[in-house]
Curated annotation (Swiss-Prot):
The gene is rpmA. One of its GO terms (cellular component) is cytosolic large ribosomal subunit. GO terms for biological process: translation. Keywords: Ribonucleoprotein, Ribosomal protein. One of its GO terms (molecular function) is structural constituent of ribosome. Pfam families: Ribosomal_L27 (PF01016). This is Large ribosomal subunit protein bL27. Belongs to the bacterial ribosomal protein bL27 family.
């Protein structure tokens, strides 16, 4: 005879993988056209000059230059300063 009753099935044991969101290029780093600067859900960061916004709200560089973060009226903007102006 069995000395233990049958164990019930557990409802745990699942977890989703991380989505790798966040800032990919930080202030002062070089960016080239098409480089992803931020992966995000919603607009935590807004696109500024020379920065585009994808349909999943990812921000990417439109021109080559240096990444520059700026806060304006409680909104965070990301700009790209072109290489010509950086010299």
């Amino acid at each position: 005879m069995a000395h233990k009753k049958a164990g019930g099935s557990t409802r745990n044991g699942r977890d989703s993988i991380g989505k790798r969101l966040g800032v990919k290029l930080f202030g002062g780093q070089k960016a080239y056209p098409g480089n992803i600067i931020v992966r995000q859900r919603g607009t935590k960061f807004h696109p500024g000059k020379n920065v585009g916004c994808g349909k999943d709200y990812s921000l990417y560089a439109l021109k080559s230059g240096i990444v520059f973060f700026k806060k304006k009226k409680n909104k965070k903007f990301i700009n790209i300063i072109p290489k010509i102006l950086c010299k």
